[in-house]
């Protein structure tokens, strides 16, 4: 059985499923942004819709890849055998902060998920999750996108 959790579906699902995800994803993102003095993000239904479509496609196809040729920034998270909370998803990405050196504006290892979260110019986010018994896929889209080569996130 497949499940999808995103706004725009049935009102009952939106009330029981999306509201907490929207609220919790935004709170988790904004908590990380506040740590470095960056303004909070606002939720975008458009970005959420695009995230939902991509999460569903990834789940159905058994894939895990960024949306090709997207004009948005994007973070992906995959969980197998357990469900993750919005806070766990964002903290997984934010954990890359240890790999980012703000003085040199360089990463030691992976840090692009973290820098996208704290990218000062990014103003909006929209996220969704799609899952089944074996796997769930989280997608967050950001606008304007971050991780512009040569620029600092904050």
Description of each model-found segment:
Residues 1-4:
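Positively charged n-region of N-terminal signal peptides that target proteins for export
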Residues 7-17:
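Hydrophobic h-region of N-terminal signal peptides that target proteins for export
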Residues 7-9, 23, 66, 117, ...:
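Generic marker of residues within folded, mature protein domains
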Residues 11-12, 29-30, 97, 106:
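Generic signal for short, ordered secondary-structure residues
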Residues 17-73:
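Short, well-ordered surface patches within globular domains
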Residues 69-72, 80-154:
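Disulfide-stabilized extracellular recognition modules
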């Amino acid at each position: 059985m497949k499940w999808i959790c995103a706004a725009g579906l049935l009102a009952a699902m939106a009330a029981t499923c999306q509201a907490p995800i929207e609220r919790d994803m935004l709170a988790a993102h904004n908590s990380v942004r506040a740590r470095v003095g960056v303004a909070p993000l606002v939720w975008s239904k458009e970005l959420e819709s695009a995230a939902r479509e991509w999460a569903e496609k990834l789940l159905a196809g058994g894939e895990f890849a960024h949306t090709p040729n997207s004009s948005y920034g994007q973070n992906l998270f995959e969980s197998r055998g357990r469900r993750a909370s919005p806070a766990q998803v964002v903290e997984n990405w934010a954990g890359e902060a240890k790999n980012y050196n703000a003085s040199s504006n360089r990463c030691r290892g992976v840090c692009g998920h973290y820098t996208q979260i704290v990218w000062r110019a990014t103003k909006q986010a929209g996220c969704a999750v799609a899952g089944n018994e074996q796997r769930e896929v989280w997608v967050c889209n950001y606008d304007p996108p971050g991780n512009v080569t040569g620029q600092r996130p904050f």
